[in-house]
Curated annotation (Swiss-Prot):
Keywords: Apoptosis, Cell cycle, Nucleus. It comes from Mus musculus. This is Protein FAM32A. May induce G2 arrest and apoptosis. May also increase cell sensitivity to apoptotic stimuli. In cell lines, may play a role in the inhibition of anchor-independent cell growth. GO terms for cellular component: nucleolus; nucleoplasm.
């Protein structure tokens, strides 16, 4: 019986896991936080522009490449936004009509 006297009596403890308990919720600060956020937004816009100028270490080719990518992206968005859903469906159906019968899907039945 002496061998069992040193046994841990209680729940097992996991390493690296904080003990779970009741934690109090933090109170929200409304007015002060809003004023600070508005002030920070004004200064952050100015600082962002300055950071862009200072931290822009791209080569001219990289800058031109990104500018063209943005331009093409805008063109794609405008092209997709110009058609309505109904027009897209009609175009798709016209495309399916032009395909050969090789692409037709045969009737599939799971009962046979």
């Amino acid at each position: 019986m002496e061998a069992y006297e040193q046994v841990q009596k209680g729940p097992l403890k996991l390493k690296g896991v904080a003990e779970l308990g009741v934690t109090k919720r933090k109170k929200k600060k409304k007015d002060k936080d809003k004023a600070k956020m508005l002030e920070a937004m004004g200064t952050s816009k100015k600082s962002e522009e300055e950071k862009r100028r200072c931290l822009d270490k791209r080569t001219p080719a990289q800058a031109a490449f990104e500018k063209m990518q943005e331009k093409r992206q805008m063109e794609r968005i405008l092209k997709k936004a110009s058609k309505t859903h109904k027009q897209r469906v009609e175009d798709f159906n016209r495309h399916l009509d032009t395909l050969t019968e090789h692409y037709d899907i045969p009737k599939v039945s799971w009962t046979k």
